[in-house]
Design a protein with these regions (language model features):
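A short, solvent-exposed beta-edge/loop patch
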Residues: 95, 107, 132-176
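An anionic, turn-rich surface loop/hairpin at beta-sheet edges
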Residues: 118-139
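Short amphipathic alpha-helices in soluble, non-transmembrane regions
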Residues: 117-124, 162-168
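Positively charged n-region of N-terminal signal peptides that target proteins for export
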Residues: 1-4, 11
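Surface-exposed, low-hydrophobicity interaction/linker segments
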Residues: 35-94, 114, 118
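C-terminal motif of bacterial Sec signal peptides marking the signal peptidase cleavage site
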Residues: 16-20
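Bacterial signal peptide processing site
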Residues: 22-25
């Protein structure tokens, strides 16, 4: 009787172990239409792969700041008048203001048209936002829910296209470049 009970318990234990280790699919934490990682992380990775020859830093853009200063920060960084089309934004710029370089990355809110947001960014940004210098090369690209606007002064031996190429390696192959 003890052997019979031991065999039944052993079989039950084996079945429970096998069913517990069965191949279940992991739960997806992001939608297939979303790029993984924060825009700050993505910007830092782009700069790590496409280095610049100046000290710069990534700053998060507060999309909830409705003050005049907050709205100016959103407009001068993204070119957008309406931050409601975004869920997050960050910018990489030089620590010295006399270098014309700005790389901004935004995550577009669900339901918004990513290409329309990109076009609004390009038409709304001021390439002369610095006092004495101007960006003469600008591109906007996007993949899934992320848009990157890069503008720079080519006298620093940089091109916007090189950053778009790096965007493709870090974020995903661009769906458009404008």
């Amino acid at each position: 009787m003890k052997k019979y009970l031991s065999v039944i318990l052993a079989a039950a234990l084996a079945l429970s172990l096998l069913s517990g280790c069965a191949g279940s699919k992991p739960t997806e934490t992001t939608s297939p239409d979303q790029v993984e990682g924060t825009v700050e992380e993505l910007l830092n990775e782009i700069v790590a792969q496409q280095p610049v020859e100046f000290d710069g830093g990534v700053e998060t853009i507060d999309l909830t700041d409705t003050s005049e200063e907050g709205q100016w920060a959103i407009k001068s960084s993204t070119g957008l008048d309406n931050a409601g089309v975004l869920t997050e934004a960050a910018v990489f710029e030089p620590m010295i203001g006399s270098i014309a370089f700005s790389m901004v990355m935004v995550r577009v809110a669900p339901g918004e048209d990513i290409k329309s947001v990109a076009e609004a960014m390009k038409s709304g940004i001021n390439p002369r936002k610095w006092v004495c210098v101007e960006a003469d090369d600008m591109l906007v690209t996007g993949y899934r829910d992320v848009v990157m606007l890069i503008m720079l002064d080519t006298s620093y031996d940089l091109t916007a296209q090189s950053f778009v190429d790096t965007f493709g390696k870090v974020v995903g192959e661009p769906e458009f470049v404008i």
